[in-house]
Amino acid sequence: GWQNTDENSTHSIPPTTARFFRFYWTPEGSEPGSEDMDAAKWKPNLKIKELRLHREARLNQWEGKVGLVWRVAQATKEEEFGKQDCYSLSQVINLTKQYTGHSNGKTLTATLPKGKWKLLRMGHTATGHTNATAGGGKGLECDKFNPKTVRKQFDNWYAQAFVKTNPEIARRVLKYMHVDSWECGSQNWNKRFAIEFQKRRGYDLMPYLPLLAGIPMESVEQSEKILRDVRTTISELVVDVFYQVLADCAKEYDCQFSAECVHYQKVDLPMGEFWLNSPTHDKPNDMLDAISGAHIYGKNIIQAEGFTEVRGTWDEYPGMLKALLDRNYALGINRLFYHVYVHNPWLDRKPGMTLDGIGLFFQRDQTWWDKGAKAFSEYATRCQSLLQYGHPVTDIAVFTGEEVPRRSILPERLVPSLPGIFGAERVESERIRLANEGQPLRVRPVGVTHSANMADPEKWVNPLRGYAYDSFNKDAILRLAKAENGRITLPGGASYKVLVLPLSRPMNPEPVLSSEVQKKINELKEAGILVPSLPYTEE
C-alpha cells in the first residue's frame, strides 16, 4: 500500500479574487479503491481539519512531488498559474553564508536591495518515524542516504548476533538477513543530498531550494522537471546506499539477503505479501513487484509473506488457505512464509501466544493443528520443490513509466490499453466497477466496512486470457534489455515477445518518455520487437 498520511494536500486552482469562497464535495464519481488508491477503499466521505487559501501560487500536490510523502499527482497546469507567478533565479538571494558566518551562528545580518522581500528559512531534521517493532532498541529511523548510518544500524542490530554469541556458530546458523515491508515514511534530504543531486543530475539544486516548499520557480514546466529529478535522486540513493550497504553486509556475514518492498535488484530473495480475508489490506502490488522484480533480475526464488489477516475470527481452515495459496503460486511465488507462527513458550495456556488479531493463527494450539496442518505444510513443500526448479514463461513486458514513485502495474489498470486482450465482457464489467454507481459498501471481515467495487485479486485470475506479463522498470529497459530473434532478452534468462507502453493511469497520469528511453524503444522496435499501438483492440 501507500503511506499517504504524513503530510497535507495542496490543490492548485486558477487565481481567484473574492471575499467569500464556497467549496462543494459530492461522493458521486468516487472511484472504488485499489492498492494504488488506498484512501478510496473506504466509505467516501470528506473530513476536513483545516482548509487554507494561499495568497500566492503553490505547485499542485507539492508535498508528494518534493518527496515528503509517497504520492503521485498530475503536473501543475499552466492555466492554474502562469510564468508571472513563478520566481526567477534573479529574484532569489542565498543568505546562507551571512547566517552561518556570523560569530554566534544564530544571527542573520544582510543588506538587501530596495523593495519587499520574503525571508524563507529552510533546514532539515529527522523524519520523525521510528523503528516501530524494535522493542528495547526503538529509536528514530536511520539516514537511508548515508552509508555510515546504515552500516551503524546493521552493526548495532543484526551483527550483534555475531558479537554476543560464538561467531563461528552464528555463521553456521544465521544464513538469512531479512528487511521487511517499508513502514518508515519518506526521506528527501540529508547533508550530502545536494552533492549527490549535482553528481547524478548534472546541475546545482541549491538555487532552486524554494521548490521544496512548493514555491514555483522559472516556470511550471521547469519546476515539475526539477522536482522529478529530486524524486529520482531519492529513489536512486535508497537503492545505491541503503540496500547496497545491507547487501554488502549480508555477504560479509555469508548470509542471503531477503527483502520486501521494491528494490529487488540488490537482494537475493525478493518477497511480496498476500492477505487472508482482508480486502482493504491485501497487497497485489507487493506480489507483482516481487514477481516481476525477480524475473527481471534473474532471482529464481520468489517469496511471499502469506495469510496476514487484519482481524482474525478463528474461522480459518486448510481448505480456505489452499485456494488462496494456489492462486499465489500460479501468480509466480515459490516460497511461503507463514504469517504468523508465533513462538509459544506456554504449555498451560490456550491458545497461547498470538500476534493479537493480526495474521493466521498457525501453531500447535490451533484447533485443527493435528487434523490438517501437517498435510497442508507438506502440500506447500511439494509445490515449492517443483516450482523452484521451474522458469517463468512470460509473453509481455509492460513498461511502468518514468513517474517517481512507481510500482508494478495492476491488471485492472491495463484494461484501457489492451481491451482486445481482456475482451468485451471484462471491458464492460470494468466500466461498471469504476463508475461505482451509488458507492456500494460491504463488510469483510467482521467490522471492516469498505467499497464493494474494489478490484479483488480473486476476480483477476488469468486476466489476459492466456497471456502473462511482467512490469518492466526503466533500469530493465535501458540497462538490461536486448533484442534477440524477435524477443526482448534479459541477462537473468527472461524473455518477452511484446513491449507495451501503457496509456495514462492513476500511478502515471502523464506517461511521457524521456529521450533516452524513447531512443532505446526505437532501437528495440527496429530490431523486431513488437510495440503495439494503443489501445490494442484486436481479439
Please annotate each region the language model reported.
Residues 38-41, 65-72, 136-139, 193-194, ...:
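Short intrinsically disordered coil segments
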Residues 1, 5-83, 181:
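Aromatic, loop-rich ligand-recognition surfaces of beta-strand-rich domains
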Residues 2-11, 74-163, 194-234, 314:
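Active-site-adjacent "subsite" loops/lids of carbohydrate-active enzymes
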